[in-house]
Regions:
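Leucine-rich repeat
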Residues: 1-522
Length: 522
């Protein structure tokens, strides 16, 4: 039971003479009275000291109790967080979150890497970060910031590299090395010295992204025959030099992205390639590389064209299934169609490299039609982006693709009006009893249109979608015939009035996957 009674010191009464002293206010104070008053004051002050001591004792006790109470409240708040859903996440999920958070970040001066920020939040996060080598296995550098200003920056970079290499343990490494743009030789020497530790771990490199000028440095010659785990390689353009043979003996290399003008077909184990990306090169150099890639199934051609001759040898690539062409002009778009046969092709994407490009105003589809007749491929996916085609030309091209299930068309933003998705195109897209219409894309399941609002004939679009909708839209599956999904993006200079498209939304309510967006253009 709590004792709330005051201490003995506080229970002492004030001296009994206080009544006598009180009467002195009405009488003359004699010498003996003065002595009594002085004694009373001495006794009262002593009593007051005892009271103050008791108050201080109680205040101290209150302070102690309040301190303990505050500490308990903090613990309650802290421990209550353990009941929140985030603490039910297993460590494996947190590791995936950290991987996503740290993805694509470069090591730059004056900024703590995201993975280290994560590891300093709390003890559990630190344990997860240090026990997950994958989040330390991507090393991305931008040299410019490390070589300018404070000379101690390279020392910090070296320390960071040591931490990443140690904490990644034996995990395969993804190495991104930005262009080396330094003017002084001592700066180059400093960077190379800093990278020695990374080069010593080249046997763990799985993905490498670097520049041709960096590979030309003498220190990088040690990579020759020391890249057993390298699977993918991206090299920026550069002049052909002694770095060309660095990757000749890479038993795991299956994906490269290069400019063929900087290499020869003997610089890589091309027969191993599964995915291939060729960039900014004349056609002969690119075709020389392609000729040996007989096992590749994915091919990307970015600005590849020109300098080709009519007598150029024809190439047959029997396993290519996916082809992406990014073109600046008609020559770029024609290279593959003129000089190759791809009988296994199922997916094709063709787009203009830049909306500001003015070099591509027309496209002769003769070689393209010849390509499809020659290849006899069963194309199932086609993406057309900002290419100079009319509706009639596009229709003639699509008539060669009866197996097409996915169609994506993006109009050229600079035209201001639709050249492909016209009223005539939409009327033909409508599936009805007309013989030509019934043979036009009979297997189409997914339609994606990016069009100008100003010249879009909405009633024809609604009719086309309605005519191709499955009979049972409420039960659409992957085996359903007809359209399963439609994505429409309308381009306009200002945010458009979307009310005319409300009628389209009824298809979404009925079960068709219907998405409508707008895109502001200049």
């Amino acid at each position: 039971m709590t004792n709330n009674q005051p201490s003995n010191a506080c229970r002492k009464s004030v001296p009994s003479s206080s009544k006598h002293i009180k009467h002195l206010f009405r009488h003359t104070v004699s010498s003996s009275d003065r002595h009594d008053v002085q004694q009373y004051l001495l006794d009262s002050e002593a009593e007051l000291c005892r009271y103050q001591a008791e108050v201080n004792r109680l205040k101290a006790k209150i302070t102690v109790v309040e301190t303990r109470m505050g500490g308990l409240k903090r613990k309650i708040r802290k421990y209550r967080t353990l009941l929140s859903p985030v603490y039910r996440l297993p460590s494996e999920i947190w590791a995936e979150v950290f991987l996503f958070f740290c993805e694509g970040e470069s090591l730059i001066p004056l900024k703590t890497p995201a993975v280290m920020v994560v590891s300093r939040v709390c003890g559990r996060w630190r344990d997860i970060a240090l026990s997950t080598p994958r989040i330390w296995s991507t090393i991305s550098l931008r040299f410019e910031g490390w070589t300018k200003g404070n000379g101690g920056r390279l020392d910090r970079l070296q320390s960071l590299l040591v931490s990443f290499l140690q904490r990644s343990k034996n995990m395969p490494l993804t190495v991104n090395l930005n262009s080396l743009r330094v003017e002084k030789q001592d700066e180059i020497d400093g960077v190379v010295k800093t990278l020695e530790g990374l080069l010593n771990h080249s046997t763990r490199w799985q993905h490498l992204d670097c520049t041709h000028s960096l590979l030309a440095l003498p220190a990088f010659q040690s990579l020759r025959n020391r890249l057993p785990e390298l699977k993918s390689l991206y090299v920026e353009s550069g002049m052909r030099d002694n770095s060309s043979s660095l990757f000749h003996d890479c038993p795991s290399l299956t994906s490269i992205s290069i400019s063929p003008d900087s290499w020869s077909d003997s610089d890589f184990p091309l027969h191993q390639m599964k995915t291939l990306s060729l960039r900014r090169s004349y056609a002969p150099a690119a075709l020389a590389v392609l000729r040996s890639c007989t096992n590749a199934y994915q091919l990307e051609m970015h600005s590849i064209g020109g300098m080709s001759r009519p007598d150029t040898d024809h190439i047959i690539l029997p396993k290519i299934r996916q082809l992406t062409i990014t073109a600046e002009n008609e020559e770029d778009a024609m290279t593959v169609f003129q000089f190759s046969t791809l009988q296994s092709l199922t997916s094709l994407e063709i787009r203009r490299s830049s909306v500001n490009s003015v070099d591509w105003n027309r496209w002769d589809l003769g070689p393209v039609k010849d390509f499809f007749l020659r290849s006899s491929c069963a194309l199932t996916s086609l993406k057309i982006g900002s290419v100079p085609l009319s509706d009639e030309e596009t229709i003639q091209l699509l008539l060669l693709m009866p197996t097409l299930t996915n169609l994506s068309i993006e109009e050229y933003p600079k035209h201001g009006k639709n050249k492909i998705v016209t009223d005539a195109f939409l009327q033909l897209l409508s599936s009805d009893e007309d013989e030509l219409a019934s043979s036009f894309l009979p297997s189409l399941n997914h339609l994606d249109l990016i069009v100008h609002l100003s010249s879009l004939h909405i009633p024809s679009l609604i009719h086309a979608i309605a005519s191709r909708a499955p009979d049972d839209m409420g039960n659409i599956s992957e085996s359903s015939c007809g359209l399963r999904s439609v994505t429409l993006t309308v381009m306009a200079k200002e945010k458009p009035d979307m009310s005319p498209f409300f009628e389209l939304q009824c298809f979404g309510d009925a079960g068709l996957r219907m998405n409508i967006f707008h895109k502001t253009i200049c």
